[in-house]
Every structure is written in structure tokens, then in C-alpha cells.
Amino acid sequence: MSHRFPAGSILFLVRPPYGDRYSYVMRPLRYSINVTLDGCCDHRAMFADEDLFRHVVENLEQADALLFGRVTYEMMEAAWRPPARPGTRPDWMEPFARTIDAAKKYVVSSTLERVDWNAELVRGDLGKAVQQLKRESGKGLLVGGVKLPLALAELGLIDEYEFVVQPRLAGHGPTLFAGLSKHVDLKLVSRLEFGSGAVAMRYEPRR
């Protein structure tokens, strides 16, 4: 049985750090998103099963912290912060729920006055703030959502992109990276197929 789930759910594997426009080695910033065959990234158009969630948990366990914008943070908090109402999700979602609940989170927002749920606000210049987070030691930062990754891609700060292509046609948007001002050339580094027909494709920028 498949279930819908927020698009901000993270599906990352550890990759070696790569240089970015700031030109020195830092812990890598990775982005993962679910997308339909016709390019829709609305989480309501997605579905997930136990195999995909197992992949999500394995990847989350290799993360130091999550990076969200306000909308994704609020969506994920509403979906996954305890306590869950009994019977609202299957047992195989519980490892993901526990892992994301415990994770350190950074929230980029100029409007929120405070956050909790193991979270810390990130304000000011986005490039400098994320650069500082990347300088810290660790395994990597994971970013989810749609709008924040667009800004990070513009700054050349994303070190890995993972697109989990769902075997579905949605017939509507939103789409990824709408308004991106320049091409970002990528090279495929891995491909993983799931029994559902979904395919996780991981790319690194061509530097």
C-alpha cells in the first residue's frame, strides 16, 4: 500500500565533499526531492511505500542537520512532530518519524520570530549563513523543499542533487527550479530503482 507524504522528506546518501563557488572543502550540502514524470513536485501528487521510507531513514541517519525554509519546516513539523494520532500512519513510517523528530534543524526565515522542534533560525545573508554551516565539521547538511533550494542553486551551494522520479503523471505544477537564472550542468553518479517503479537518480554539479 502506498501513501502520500510531504515533498520535503529527505532521501540522501553520503557523498564526498566537493568544492563550490567558495572554493574550499566544507561538509557537503545535499538536496533531494520527489518529482513526477511530468515534473510536478507537489507532495500531494506523490506516494511512498515501505521500501522508499527505509531508504529515507538510512539516508537521514547519515545527516548532521536538516536545512528548511519556513514553508517546508512548518509542513514537516505538522506532519511528523509527536504525538501522532493513533491510526494516522502505518507502523513502517515510525522509524522515519523518530529520526526526523530527533534531527537538528536549521530554518531559513525572515518572518518567524522563534522555532523549536530541535530547530534554530538562520537569518541575514543566505550565502554567508549557509557557508558558515558548511564550514562546520560533520557528514553533511540536507535541504528539502522547493523555494530555498532554488536560491541555493543560484548561489552554487548545492553539492548533490537527488531526484526521486515517481511513476506518475500529475498534469499540474509546481515545477522545480522555476526562474533559475542560469544552467546548472549535472553528472549522474548513481541510480536506484524501487519496486514501485520510482527511480532515485543522484547527480553532482559539473564544476
For each feature predicted by the language model, list its residue ranges.
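N-terminal amphipathic/basic-hydrophobic helices that include classical n-h-c signal peptides
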Residues: M1-V25
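Enzymes that bind and transform nitrogen-containing heteroaromatic metabolites
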Residues: Y18-R207
